[in-house]
C-alpha cells in the first residue's frame, strides 16, 4: 500500500512539472488546398486562473507537396493571455530566462513551438512569449502577451517574491 502511495505521489509530481497540453478550440480554413489556422487554449500549469490562446498555421499535405519543405510548418505564432479565474501562483521560475509553459513540435524532428513565462517583478506582470526554437537557426518571429497582477488578489503559494 505504501508503494502505491509513493508511486502515485511521484506520478503527480512528474505531471505537475510537465509543460501544459493544448486544447484545440478552433480551426479556420484559409484556402482551397487545406491550409488552416489553428487556435488552441493553454492553461498555465503553475499559475491557476490564467489561460493563453495561441494560433498558428497548419500546412496541408497538398501545400507540402506543391512547395517542398515537407516536414515543417511556418514559425508564425500569435498569443493572447488573460485571467480566466482567481489567480494562484505556484512555484514559478523567477529568473529573467523564464520558464517553458508549453511546447509542441512543428516539424518532423527539430523545430518546436514554445510558450515561455517570465515574471516581471518590478511591474508585477506575467509575460508570455510565443516563439519557435530550432537546433541550428532561431527565428525572429514571436508574439507576446501580458497578464498584470498589480492590484489583483493573487494567492502566492510560496509567498509573494
Descriptions of predicted regions:
Residues 24, 87-161:
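Low-complexity intrinsically disordered segments
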Residues 1-8:
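Bacterial N-terminal signal peptides that target proteins for export
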Residues 17-19:
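N-terminal signal peptide c-region/cleavage motif recognized by signal peptidases
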Residues 10-14:
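Hydrophobic alpha-helical targeting segments used for export or membrane insertion
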Residues 42-44, 57, 84-86, 133, ...:
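Generic structural motif
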Residues 23-80:
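N-terminal secretory signal peptides
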Residues 57-109:
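Structured domain cores in non-transmembrane regions
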Amino acid at each position: 500500500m505504501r508503494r502505491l502511495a509513493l508511486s502515485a505521489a511521484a506520478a503527480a509530481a512528474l505531471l505537475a512539472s510537465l509543460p501544459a497540453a493544448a486544447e484545440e478550440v478552433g480551426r479556420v480554413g484559409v484556402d482551397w488546398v487545406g491550409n488552416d489556422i489553428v487556435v488552441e487554449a493553454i492553461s498555465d500549469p503553475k499559475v491557476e486562473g490564467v489561460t493563453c490562446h495561441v494560433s498558428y498555421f497548419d500546412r496541408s499535405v497538398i501545400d507540402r507537396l506543391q512547395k517542398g519543405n515537407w516536414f515543417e510548418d511556418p514559425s508564425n505564432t500569435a498569443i493572447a493571455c488573460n485571467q480566466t479565474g482567481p489567480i494562484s501562483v505556484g512555484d514559478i521560475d523567477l529568473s529573467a530566462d523564464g520558464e517553458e509553459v508549453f511546447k509542441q513540435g512543428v516539424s518532423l524532428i527539430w523545430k518546436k513551438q514554445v510558450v515561455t513565462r517570465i515574471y516581471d517583478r518590478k511591474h508585477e506582470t506575467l509575460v508570455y512569449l510565443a516563439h519557435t526554437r530550432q537546433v541550428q537557426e532561431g527565428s525572429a518571429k514571436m508574439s507576446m502577451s501580458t497578464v498584470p497582477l498589480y492590484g489583483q488578489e493573487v494567492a502566492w503559494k510560496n509567498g509573494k517574491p
